[in-house]
Amino acid sequence: AFVQEPLPY
C-alpha cells in the first residue's frame, strides 16, 4: 500500500 501525502491546494 502507498501512503498519499496531502497535496497543497
UniProtKB/Swiss-Prot annotation:
Q: What does the record's cofactor remark say about binding?
A: Binds 1 Fe cation per subunit.
CC cofactor: Fe cation
Query: What is catalysed by this protein?
Result: 2 superoxide + 2 H(+) = H2O2 + O2
Tell me, what is one Gene Ontology molecular-function annotation carried by this entry?
metal ion binding
Which keywords describe this protein according to UniProt? Answer: Iron, Metal-binding, Oxidoreductase
Enzyme Commission numbers on file: 1.15.1.1
The organism's place on the tree of life at top rank: Bacteria
Summarizing the function annotation, the protein's role is: Destroys superoxide anion radicals which are normally produced within the cells and which are toxic to biological systems.
Member of which family?
Belongs to the iron/manganese superoxide dismutase family.
**How does the record describe its quaternary structure?**
Homodimer.
The name under which this protein is listed is Superoxide dismutase [Fe]
Organism of origin: Anabaena sp. (strain L31)
